């Protein structure tokens, strides 16, 4: 068994955990998530811990399953969040309930549809906060927004993650 899979996932008292056939249902204060587990992995709940047992040939999948379960439990209890910042003169963002409008140096504003289960806030014109209960979905939406105008290496203009360090290149010299 992998090192990751050997650690149990801790459940808090406000989280409901249920396994039916191969589908895992986790419900918490922020919402509910479902996950279809692989056939060769068996999930057992004892008190407030989730353990898994596996056959020897599927150790990699057991570690992945444990990580996905942990992300689901954390998502329905605390939620996930990614922060983006806009760097550049005149770059700004404005969020409504259904769309995010980005002005990032193109001749037109870029409209980004907000998927279901994701909330996007703009505390200031140059900050975007993406939050939700599904870690994969939050990360994918953040990557999609960043891909509208990724940071360029000479001046650092573009949309970047809040904690991302842009390594700047030196301009050509004659």
Where are these regions (language model features)?
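N-terminal intrinsically disordered, cationic/polar leader segments
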Residues: 2-143, 147-161, 165-174
């Amino acid at each position: 068994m992998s090192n990751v899979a050997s650690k149990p996932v801790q459940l808090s008292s406000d989280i409901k955990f249920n396994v039916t056939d191969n589908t895992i249902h986790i419900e918490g204060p922020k919402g509910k998530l479902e996950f279809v587990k692989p056939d060769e992995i068996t999930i057992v709940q004892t008190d407030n811990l989730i353990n898994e047992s596996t056959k020897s040939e599927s150790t990699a999948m057991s570690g992945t399953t444990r990580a996905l379960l942990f992300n689901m439990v954390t998502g329905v209890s605390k939620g996930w969040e990614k922060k983006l910042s806009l760097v550049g003169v005149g770059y700004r963002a404005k969020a409504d309930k259904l769309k995010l409008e980005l002005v990032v140096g193109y001749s037109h504003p870029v409209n980004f549809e907000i998927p279901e289960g994701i909330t996007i806030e703009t505390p200031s014109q140059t900050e975007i906060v993406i939050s939700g209960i599904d870690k994969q979905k939050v990360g994918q939406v953040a990557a999609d927004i960043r891909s509208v105008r990724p940071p360029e290496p000479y001046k650092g203009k573009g949309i970047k993650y809040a904690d991302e360090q842009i390594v700047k290149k030196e301009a050509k010299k004659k």
